[in-house]
Design a protein with these regions (language model features):
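Carbohydrate-active catalytic/glycan-binding domains of CAZyme proteins
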Residues: 1-359
Length: 359
């Protein structure tokens, strides 16, 4: 298995590192440094049904070609003693994001943590390091703007180095907030976008910019079950956004190719290649279970009245989101290229694709 070598990307299939082990880097992103790609994310290897283990730290991998990834280790280890600590392995740590601060020469990582006992309590943990591989020093754990902050993305404006955070103020709206110059806090200035109610309110923001247009991919709130991606386009931070159509095309559009986007990576060796980095959290969901049925099971909101009458269907659907039955240790990755029709991003399914074919 250690001799496995890839020369293409196979979305949704098991992806092994250069040691022959399944890659564990969920909900994170990719950063390019000195001709090397670094892929970081949640380590879910121990998150098996009924284990009580939500995560086992933040992993990082390195690669020269984005096909073959070397395991560099756990760059943020879990806390194992104090179960009240936000980084304890039973706490719901998700979606690490890293940006580099040129002023302080620090790598700055933010991590979302949902309280294991009360999911309505969510905060951020901020850490810094001199090297992408650590060691990382914890700076603070806090509620930005005094809010319970859910899924998020960090954004660094390459023109002036100013940074922003997009996060979902849980179950209500999307927030765009300015970061301080050291990227360790928010300034207090923010704007509000996409207000709604579950399951339609947006989460999992993934930002990218192309040809002076800014974009945000988001998903609805259906636990780990996939749903249609939404695209919003805007000209400047804090200005109103224009809602576009679902970027996914074809038969897999309604469930975003059975995935949830965590980041969009602009490939640095091509002029116009953007890659949607997504997780397939659940690999064994029957295709007849659709996201509206899951929504009905989760929220009982009447969005799927026929299925609302089918208790057996709802029970089957809801079980895939329960900690005692779901198995995120088996989660996989769905990486797909993004093409554009004018200013509209399009994501199409490929069983296999090569980066070189899009450069």
């Amino acid at each position: 298995m250690a001799d496995t070598k890839y020369n293409s990307i196979h979305p949704g299939e098991l992806w092994l590192d250069t040691d022959g082990n399944p890659i564990q880097a969920h909900g994170g992103g990719i950063i390019y440094i000195n001709d090397t790609f670094y892929w970081y994310g949640e380590n879910k290897e121990k998150s098996k049904p009924g284990s009580g283990i939500w995560h086992w730290g933040v992993n990082c991998y390195s690669s020269k070609d984005m096909y073959n990834w070397k395991y560099e280790g756990i760059i943020v280890p879990p806390t194992t003693e104090d179960d009240k600590d936000p980084l304890h392995y039973t706490q719901c740590m998700d979606r690490p994001h890293i940006i580099y601060n040129d002023r302080t020469s620090k790598f700055v990582m933010w991590i979302k943590v949902m309280n294991k006992e009360n999911p309505n309590i969510q905060q951020m943990v901020v850490l810094t390091a001199d090297n992408i591989l650590g060691p990382y020093t914890r700076i603070r754990a806090f509620h930005p703007l005094g809010m319970n902050s859910g899924d998020f993305d960090l954004v660094k404006n390459p023109s002036d180095g100013k940074a922003y955070i997009f996060f979902d103020r849980i179950h209500s709206e999307m927030i765009c907030a300015d970061l301080t110059d050291d990227y360790l806090d928010v300034t207090g200035f923010y704007s509000v976008h996409m207000p709604n109610v579950p399951p339609f309110v947006r989460e999992a923001p993934a930002f990218f910019e192309r040809k002076n247009k800014k974009y945000l991919f988001t998903s609805a709130i259906t636990g780990y079950f996939p749903n249609p991606t939404e695209t919003d386009m805007f000209d400047c931070f804090h200005l109103p956004m224009t809602k576009l159509e679902n970027p996914h095309r074809g038969a897999k559009a309604a469930n975003s190719c059975f995935s949830q986007i965590s980041a969009v990576f602009k490939y640095p060796k091509a002029d116009d290649l953007y890659i949607a980095i997504a997780d397939r959290w659940l690999i064994d969901v029957p295709p007849e279970l659709d996201y509206l049925g899951i929504s009905a099971g989760l929220y009982g909101d009447g969005t799927h009245p026929v299925i609302m009458e089918e208790d057996e269907y709802i029970e089957r659907a809801a079980k895939f989101n329960r900690p005692d039955t779901r198995d995120t240790s088996k989660a996989r990755y769905v990486w797909l290229p993004i093409r554009f029709e004018a200013n509209t991003p399009i994501i199409e399914w490929y069983d296999e694709w090569k980066i070189e074919d899009f450069c």
